[in-house]
Design a protein with these regions (language model features):
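A solvent-exposed, acidic/Ser-Thr-rich amphipathic alpha-helical stretch
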Residues: 4, 20-73
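Generic short beta-strand segments
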Residues: 79-85
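Low-complexity, intrinsically disordered terminal/linker segments enriched in charged
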Residues: 110-130
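Hydrophobic/aromatic beta-strand elements that line small-molecule binding cavities or substrate pockets
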Residues: 64-70, 82, 96-102
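Active-site neighborhoods of divalent-metal-dependent phosphate/nucleic-acid chemistry enzymes
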Residues: 86-88, 92
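Hydrophobic pocket/interface hotspot
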Residues: 10, 22-23, 30, 43, ...
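Short, low-complexity N-terminal intrinsically disordered segments enriched in polar/charged residues
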Residues: 1-28, 125-130
Length: 130
C-alpha cells in the first residue's frame, strides 16, 4: 500500500471548509460524486464551491475524521466519521460513511461517497412539540 498521508490532508480540508484545498487534490476535470444523494460536481471550481458553502449553509462545526485509509498509484479508499451541529435546527449529527476514488498522476479524477442520508435526516429533524 502507498502513502495515505494525503488522505488525512484531503479530509482535514473538508473539516476546515477549505474549498480551494479540497479542489487542489483534483485533476482540472475531476469529479466529486455523492452516489447516495445523488449529486455530481465536475471540475475544481464546482468542487471548491461545494466545500466553501458547507459552514454557511449547513454546519459551522462540521468535522470529519478518517479511518482505515488505503491508497496506491491509481486508487484510494477510506472510511469517515462526520459530526457536528445542523445550524438551522441546532440538532447534533453523527454519521459514518466511506469514500473511494481513482487517481491519475497524483490527482483525483473521480471521487465517490457512500453514506446514509436518511440517517442524517432523522438526526437533524426538528423536534416536534407534544
Amino acid at each position: 500500500m502507498g502513502d495515505t498521508s494525503w488522505i488525512e490532508m484531503f479530509v482535514a480540508a473538508w473539516s476546515a471548509a477549505d474549498g480551494d484545498a479540497v479542489a487542489a487534490h483534483f485533476a482540472p476535470d475531476g469529479v466529486w460524486e455523492d452516489v447516495t444523494m445523488p449529486f455530481r460536481h465536475e471540475g475544481r471550481a464546482p468542487i471548491a464551491d461545494m466545500w466553501t458553502r458547507v459552514p454557511t449553509e449547513f454546519s459551522a462545526d462540521s468535522h470529519f475524521e478518517v479511518a482505515n485509509p488505503v491508497s496506491d498509484a491509481d486508487r484510494y479508499a477510506f472510511q469517515w466519521h462526520w459530526t457536528g451541529t445542523h445550524d438551522p435546527t441546532g440538532r447534533r449529527y453523527d454519521i459514518r460513511g466511506a469514500s473511494m476514488g481513482v487517481v491519475r498522476e497524483g490527482l483525483i479524477v473521480h471521487h465517490y461517497d457512500y453514506w446514509n442520508p436518511a440517517q442524517l435526516a432523522a438526526q437533524i429533524r426538528p423536534e416536534t412539540e407534544s
